[in-house]
Amino acid sequence: MTTLFNQPLNVINVGIAMFSDDLKKQHVPVIQLDWTPPGQGNMQVVEALDQLAEKPLAEKIAAANNIALERIIQSHPVLVGYDQAINVVPGMTRTTILHAGPPVSWENMCGAMKGAVTGALVFEGLATDLEDAARLAASGEITFSPCHEHDCVGSMAGVTSASMFMHIVENKTYGNRAFTNLSEQMAKILRMGANDQSVIDRLNWMRDVLGPMLRDAMNIIGEIDLRLMLAQALHMGDECHNRNNAGTTLLIQALTPGLIQAGYPVAQQREVFEFVASSDYFSGPTWMAMCKAALDAAHGIEYSTVVTTMARNGYEFGLRISGLPGQWFTGPAQQVIGPMFAGYKPEDSGLDIGDSAITETYGIGGFAMATAPAIVALVGGTVEEAIDFSRQMREITLGENPNVTIPLLSFMGIPTAIDITRVAGSGILPVINTAIAHKDAGIGMIGAGIVHPPFSCFEKALLTFRDRYFL
């Protein structure tokens, strides 16, 4: 006993963190065990987990989940073209505005989304100015709908209108297509809620110059293998959500022969290359559409508990589950925690927003941060934490994707197929790295960081799944 008290004190604390915090202040080594009971203590969730574990239902769920996992892994998305939304997006009309996240009314839209909507209405010529656009948006004459319900995804506010050029990504394995608009690059842009004349002028140029050049280039090239390019980008230090240095280089490399052969004036070619070089985010939307094409192939499988959508609109966070097609499970959008740009404070930030969490749903972004340790300079945290995120996400997924691997973790495949029962049982929430938009319209991006979905989304999904399938 005397020997015990003469040894250095090493502490593992389970439960309330205040005890470990006090020990840290006294310079005592301490490990805080981040543990929560199954279902975060909600006995309804615990009961539902037990019910779903009973045979023969558990066997049906396992079989369905194997199919979902296989469809995600076997999906082979390729870029096949670019065209205006009105020509390719299902359900698009001249008076339709698509947005990120689950359904949301004009009244409940956050500042960044309202800014993007009003800017898009001016861009489309449906309103004379931003004030007129706000009146029109509130009038009921504009149809608002989630991108995800139109085979689309949209970064940040995700606002997509008829004239905008879209990526066209085809899943060669299963034949479905996915779409997303072009990157405006970074900072003061529509998708972040900015909407002044400089933003509208850029959108006009993208419609009149960039979009047609990309369209004609792809008509020459035919297709670009995005799954292969994604695997290469991760091996080159990207995680393909918020760090895209390698991916953008690879994508413009593949596009360049077509852009040159398309026959546009040298001055316009230079404008396009300078635009791409202005930010590494050019390939960001490309990966989003790729992930969407793969995950849609796994949506609508009876008995499957796999998450096929995670999306946010600055007001709510929403999930969709393979075995419960057509339903959204929502909870309040969360505060993103991370470094702010100079001059901004956390209280300036809007809540979590964007469809870009489709990347994490697929297994990249926050799930693959071990491939991109340099990203911590943007989103905060340490290299060790970034690596641990990739390990931890394997605990809430059904498998690994051997087509897309993480060199630092002995070429482990990216964690693939989030399972609501594993999230509910472990209490581990998916990790998302993301940009931060200002809470007010008209300003734009003010930082980046880490965020998690609210547990209530998974709770609602699990209980609804139990009610649907447990007989």
Where are these regions (language model features)?
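Anaerobic metallocofactor- and corrinoid-dependent redox/one-carbon enzyme cores
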Residues: 2-471
